[in-house]
Amino acid sequence: VKEVYLDEDLISEIRDMRPKLIGIDAPLTLPRGRRGVEDKEGPKFRLCDLELRERGIKFFPVTLGPMRSLTLRGIMLKEKLEKLNYRVVEVYPGATQDILGIPRKSRGLSLLREGLRRLGVRGVREGLSGDELDAITAAITVQLYLEGKAEFIGDPTEGLILIPKG
């Protein structure tokens, strides 16, 4: 795990790794019919969001204050990576943690670290931030997909989220 802040640095790291699939922990699409993140009148949820809710998984909608900038950055990063011929998917570590039965970072970083270790993840050391632990969880989601143990929820024409099969 390595923290990077600028898109250019992230893309450089990705080029070095040459992944088969990239999971981004941010909304990568807007609800169908929504004109932008600042649109006050458009739909608030995507089908994939509603499917999370049906499964009892809590999330922040793309229209919520701080999620707006995260959504914009996610969409722009996805576009940059796809132009470089990478396959990019949306992941939600909170959903993966809930489905796999490990605590979210809101319950405490030590509990999340221990949960990741129980899953067999090596290198989960003290001092990793909540964002880094979520990045590890995102990578687990992608690995599960590559092993046939994860699925997409939502509508392909609106947006999909990759989650472990329950």
Identify the residue ranges that each predicted region occupies:
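Phosphate- and other anionic-substrate recognition elements at nucleic-acid/protein interfaces
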Residues: 1-166
